[in-house]
Structure formats: C-alpha cells, structure tokens
Amino acid sequence: NMRTADHMNLSRYIMDHMYAGASKLQKAAFIFGSIEPDINMLTYFRGSIHGEEKLRGHNYENVMKYMEKLTKKLEKGGMGTVRQSFLLGKLVHYVADSFTYPHNSIFPENLREHCQYETELHDYVNQMISSDNVNLDSIDDGIDIVEYLEEIHYRYVSEALGCENDYRHITHAISVVTERFWQTESVSVPSMRDVAIACKEHIPVTANVSMAAAGNAGMEPTGVA
C-alpha cells in the first residue's frame, strides 16, 4: 500500500500545481485530510463489523460505500472551504488506496510480499514526483464521479498490476476528484466559521506537526512513513 508520506507528497504536489493561490489553511486542511485515515486507527476496522476481514478497512471492497458517502457530502457542499478541503483530502486518500495493488482482494495474502511491494511503490512514487511526472487531469462536469471511478477501477484491475499501473491510475484519479470538488475561496483570508470548523475537526490538535509540514511546501515530511 502507499505510505503516509506518499499520500502527503502527492496531495502537496496537487496543491502546488493546481491550487497554488489557495490559502495556507485550506491547503493544509486538504493535505491533512489526505493522511488522516492512516493515523486514525478506527478506519482500519471498516468492514470488520460485517464479518469481513479485520484491519482491511482501506481496501477498495470495504471502502466503496464510504467513498460514495463522502462524494455525496462534497457534491452537496455548503460547509465552508476548510471542512470541504479536509473531507476532499480524505476522499483523495481512499481513492489513491483503491488503485494500490495490496488494497485490492486480488493481492496475494502474504505479509512479506506486502511489505516488499510497499517499498517498491514508495520508491517509484518518489522517483516520479522528483522528475515532475504527475498526471493532473480533469473530466467533464456532467460525468458521474462515482460511476467514473468504478469504471476506471474495473479497467485498472484488468491491466498488468504493478507500480506503474498503480501510479498512473492513482495520479489520474486523485487529480480528477480534486478538480471536481475543490471549492475556491471567495476571500484570501479564511472566515472565523472555517477556523471553528477546523478546530472541530481536530486539525490543529491531533496533527499540529503534520499541519506545519503540510502548510510549508518546501518542507520534507518527517516522522511519517
């Protein structure tokens, strides 16, 4: 699966290249949202209560309904730019995981292979980002985003599985989702309502270090792997 640092670096790349003019708070909320599922242990139990495999809560099969729920919230909007950005970051995290080989049921159940693949994907993602090789795409507004993700996931699992296939679909899918649901701020300074919502989401409480890193595009993430 993708490491937390890879989620952070990809979401930061999207902010730097698609929404460089957004406020630091809005960008930080998005980037923190993109790593929050990895540091929230409860998310790994998604699906377990229904008798499915334990600690597979980030797997595509277990997270499909939750992604659809997040999508509906984002489509409805009206929640302020900080909360919108945070939830969008969470959706981007799960979308990226959906196109990661070990997060699909077709991956062989072998811990050694899982760890080896994680390292290989981490190196591949770093190499691609360092060489500025990131697909930033969009789709027509009339296309249903949930149906589109299901369609490209079907195509994804039918192709040769590996780091290249993962990365190509991950970067396409997360940029499409971000472009669809990004909410442009009407003013450059976040409102008090947005700040209050950020506090409600525990953004500055549970990840003040991560937030500082997320808000500084030039800082390498530390302590997150």
Predicted features, each with a name:
Residues 1-90, 95-225:
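N-terminal leader/auxiliary helical segments
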